[in-house]
Amino acid sequence: MAVRELPGAWNFRDVADTATALRPGRLFRSSELSRLDDAGRATLRRLGITDVADLRSSREVARRGPGRVPDGIDVHLLPFPDLADDDADDSAPHETAFKRLLTNDGSNGESGESSQSINDAATRYMTDEYRQFPTRNGAQRALHRVVTLLAAGRPVLTHCFAGKDRTGFVVALVLEAVGLDRDVIVADYLRSNDSVPQLRARISEMIQQRFDTELAPEVVTFTKARLSDGVLGVRAEYLAAARQTIDETYGSLGGYLRDAGISQATVNRMRGVLLG
């Protein structure tokens, strides 16, 4: 029976649940593992996961804590973006979009007076974020490591904070590299929308904890209103924006993989492992 819950995390799944051409038990995805409890750790052991690819930035790890995984599981810190050589903000993509919503002064007609205008602005911001994904420092390194681990036959769980944006990007490229149809790739990606309520609750909690005293009711209302589905959910056009950047900058996914140092032989081995 497929395991569909990871206690202490959310947005968890075996990618093979949706991408049924994949062998089960090879590629998993989830939110952060910083609150994994004993039952969650037991689940990881039962699933036979050997490696965790943590795509969070160093600041996210410091702020939220490392993954609480069992001994014997290798954790690969693959910050995306990697600020060791990049001056960009190291917030999670949805956090960056959320900050833009909070600080927007309405000068561009995006004052957020209605829920629809907030969601429209959020969608634009998230699309902009995804458009930059392929060229962000750390993106190709993260993809290279995940592909290499999978090609070596090691069951991998990939995660970021929410398990939807950076994780969604990396998983989508893995699935495309092994030859899965676009509709299957998008179907797995969109499943993260089922976890929006948990993400909204977690972010609301984080916002509250950043203040020494309880927020004024009007501030809470203003803030929560900007936790729109455009920021917290995923859309097919977000993934398409990232994919367009790959084609425009590298010519094709193959070109992107080669630039990342991923050989065709490695891709072939990964395909053999994942498809059987």
Swiss-Prot record:
The record marks K164 as: Important for substrate specificity. Binding to host ubiquitin is required to activate the phosphatidylinositol phosphate phosphatase activity. Phosphatase activity is inhibited by sodium orthovanadate, a specific inhibitor of tyrosine phosphatases, but not by okadaic acid, an inhibitor of serine/threonine phosphatases. Inhibition of the enzyme reduces mycobacterial survival in infected macrophages. Inhibitors also enhance killing efficacy by first-line antibiotics. PROSITE patterns: TYR_PHOSPHATASE_2. Essential virulence factor that promotes mycobacterial survival within host macrophages. Acts as a phosphatase that possesses triple substrate specificity toward phosphotyrosine, phosphoserine/threonine and phosphoinositides. Supports mycobacteria survival during infection by modulating the normal host signaling pathways, attenuating the bactericidal immune responses and promoting the host cell survival. This is Triple specificity protein phosphatase PtpB. The important role played by PtpB in virulence and the lack of PtpB human orthologs make it a highly promising target for the treatment of tuberculosis infections. Several classes of potent inhibitors have been developed and studied to date. Drug candidates include, among others, (oxalylamino-methylene)-thiophene sulfonamide (OMTS), isoxazole-based compounds, highly substituted indolo[2,3-a]quinolizidines, benzofuran salicylic acid derivatives, chalcone derivatives and several 2-oxo-1,2-dihydrobenzo[cd]indole-6-sulfonamide and piperazinyl-thiophenyl-ethyl-oxalamide derivatives. CDD domains: TpbA-like (cd14529). Residues 232-250 are annotated as: UIM-like region. Disruption phenotype: Disruption of the gene impairs the ability of the mutant strain to survive in activated murine macrophages and in guinea pigs, but not in resting murine macrophages. Infection of guinea pigs with the mutant strain results in a 70-fold reduction in the bacillary load of spleens in infected animals. Disruption of the gene has no significant effect on the morphology and growth of the mutant in defined liquid culture medium. Pfam families: Y_phosphatase3 (PF13350). Keywords: Host cell membrane, Host cytoplasm, Host membrane, Hydrolase, Membrane, Protein phosphatase, Secreted, Virulence. One of its GO terms (biological process) is symbiont-mediated suppression of host inflammasome-mediated signal transduction. Changing C160S: Shows less than 1% of wild-type activity. Does not affect macrophage apoptosis. Gene3D superfamilies: Protein tyrosine phosphatase superfamily (3.90.190.10). It comes from Mycobacterium tuberculosis (strain ATCC 25618 / H37Rv). One of its GO terms (cellular component) is host cell plasma membrane.
